[in-house]
Design a protein with these regions (language model features):
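A short helix-loop-beta-strand connector motif used in the catalytic cores of GNAT acetyltransferases and
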Residues: 45-59, 91
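Conserved GNAT acetyl-CoA-binding A-motif
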Residues: 118-129
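A short beta-loop-alpha structural element at the N-terminal edge
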Residues: 4-18, 27
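Conserved GNAT-fold acetyl-CoA-binding loop/helix
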Residues: 24-47
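Conserved beta-strand in the GNAT
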Residues: 60, 66-75, 91, 96
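Conserved beta-strand-loop-alpha-helix junction that forms the acyl-donor binding cleft
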Residues: 127-137, 154-157
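Conserved acetyl-CoA-binding loop-helix of GNAT-fold acetyltransferases
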Residues: 97, 103-116, 143
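Conserved active-site tyrosine of GNAT-family acetyltransferases
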Residues: 65, 141, 146
Length: 157
């Protein structure tokens, strides 16, 4: 099976919905106290805005003409921050691969393309957030070489 990693086009907005549903279900199952049961999709307007914004990156993974994965990311510019030096960070919002296509290297290809893009944009690092219940994602990102930098804590009232 040949995997093609490419930049998204407008038609992909509808084609990624099954993947967004998988992510929404995963988050709801892991934290039903925080996440709604219904998936929230990008509107076509929001998707179009991200496609046109040079700071945003939307990558698509295709296998045999089917969208089987995607990555959403954008550049965060830290300037004149109270504690950080000035730098650009490539923030990965989502990397998602259909359940039926996991463990085939597709996520790794998306991650590697994110790295290439981050380097081209002269970013210092890549950053992301992952919920502690999402053990598969944590293992995947660690396998890709990411390390834990901070830990966000919560106290439920």
């Amino acid at each position: 099976m040949e995997i093609i990693i490419r930049n998204a086009v407008m038609e992909d907005c509808a084609r990624i919905r099954p993947l967004q549903k998988e992510i929404a279900d995963l988050h709801h199952d892991g934290r039903p106290d925080l996440f709604k049961t219904e998936a929230r999709y990008f509107t076509e307007e929001a998707f179009a805005q991200r496609l046109q914004d040079p700071k945003h990156t939307i990558l698509i993974a295709e296998a045999d003409g089917q969208v089987v994965g995607y990555a959403f990311a954008w550049v965060i510019a830290y300037r004149n921050h109270s504690t950080y030096v000035d730098f650009d960070c490539f923030y990965i919002d989502d990397i998602c691969v259909l359940k039926s296509h996991r463990r085939m290297g597709i996520g790794k290809q998306l991650f590697e393309r994110c790295k290439e893009t981050a380097r081209q944009l002269h970013c210092k690092n890549m950053d992301l957030g992952v919920f502690s219940f999402n053990r598969d994602a944590i293992a995947f990102y660690e396998h890709c070489g990411m390390t834990e930098r901070t830990r966000r804590m919560e106290y439920t009232l």
